[in-house]
């Protein structure tokens, strides 16, 4: 596999050096793009919410996504133009539903290969299990611990992961190729792949050990002269970083977030930016460039149309729109159905195991204070699992909660439902913090202003925060309480978090630097399963543990 890949790169380089006749007229190119697929081989529960075309004040839920429907949508769009390419902006794997995660996301890699994906940026979730595992997914081979669990030996990705800004700290070389070049009627187009530079702060340290994540702008701008020296003028960036728009899925009013500043600083030679990470949908013009994002889980495909100049080889025109991968409009792709069915049969004994019931769905929608019903459940489960280690309260990062918990129509909850909520296999860790240290940790919830991360808290613990105060001063002094009693700043507390938070993930550095006497416990999903089994039926409670003051 490595030899074939190396030969392919050499051949591509040789072809770039050949004199290929330029076309007589402009060349139309169609780029199809997705992002943040996260192993959603089956349509995600909840589909996608869009503005009601009949009433702008309302929204509609459209059943969308899933590999079977995505493959059909891509095939239909691809048929419109023989000059096409299918690409992605990262997080194709990681935080995946059970049918993919149980097999280390090999099913997703195979499914995307069947769709004809050609290149993708590496996202932060591609590092959930470390760079060695990412390279295995690229090159193929059995998992080092679990072996080959799938219906056939795993051959690796047929598409190319790109990592221009991810560098081996020892060698200084990129972990994976920095870009991919494809010719359309003789005109080369470069696709540069970027991982967000904040990846070390949102992935467990073991996942990024030995790697450097360099500045996105500096990386791209340094590559531009080399690409242009090769005769490449059309440049597309695939970046796993994004923004927060305020409009509908095909609009871009008032976009904010890191992508804006990044795109504004790119070399003018960059023509199109395909983004992701924020799980939002938009089609924008930023600093004169086309910028797209296609929501998440394969619910949308960005359809990007370029017109290449036959003389300069540069992009003359660029336009785009986001297409909903509607489960009503598109038929299931037969090859995807067969692939998924193979893995579903293997996963069924575990996936369909009944673990409990819900009296009503527990949503991950946030209250004004930042609480969620499913977050409360998980925090309570983690506290219950660690009381024997002296735990007095538990805190859960919202990014580790990937879905609401609804069960089936009768409220029956199966293991696959729990896994959809907590797919990371994090151990629980109980540490000692003083009241003052706990307050400092809570202040770190607002360090990342565009994306505050309000920790979910267990029953019996609560506090107030003031939205009018600046970050670092938002927790109301004296408001921290445990079972109704005020927490003294010097009071030692046993606090349970998951291993990701214990290592300082999401910039919660207090847990890593100041937590004492760590004790490792169950896996998070095991704690949740035990909690559900012990209670039989759970119901959403009042979202009143955290109080927001405006």
Regions picked out by a protein language model, each given a short descriptive name:
Residues 1-4:
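Positively charged n-region of N-terminal signal peptides that target proteins for export
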Residues 353-371:
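Glycine-rich phosphate/diphosphate-binding loops and the adjacent beta-loop-alpha structural elements
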